[in-house]
Amino acid sequence: AEGCDRGFSRSDELTRHIRIHTGHKPFQCRICMRNFSRSDHLTTHIRTHTGEKPFACDYCGR
């Protein structure tokens, strides 16, 4: 893209970066139909629907 001077050592990183310029969001939540450019963002988002909290504090258990 014009004005973008980013470089990447891996093609998958470039593919992910290009989505910033194109607005392409290929990952869709099946519950609310919201779209995301990255699969890890979709995974985190789905937890808002399921209530899953996979990380607990080692000190207090919360």
Curated annotation (Swiss-Prot):
This is Early growth response protein 2. Pfam families: zf-C2H2. It is found in: Nucleus. A zinc finger (C2H2-type) spans 1-21, 27-49, 55-62. Coiled coil: none annotated. One of its GO terms (molecular function) is zinc ion binding. One of its GO terms (cellular component) is nucleus. It comes from Poecilia reticulata (Guppy). Sequence-specific DNA-binding transcription factor. Binds to two specific DNA sites located in the promoter region of HOXA4. The keyword Transcription regulation applies. The gene is egr2. Keywords: Activator, DNA-binding, Metal-binding, Nucleus, Repeat, Transcription, Transcription regulation, Zinc, Zinc-finger. Belongs to the EGR C2H2-type zinc-finger protein family. It comes from the Eukaryota.
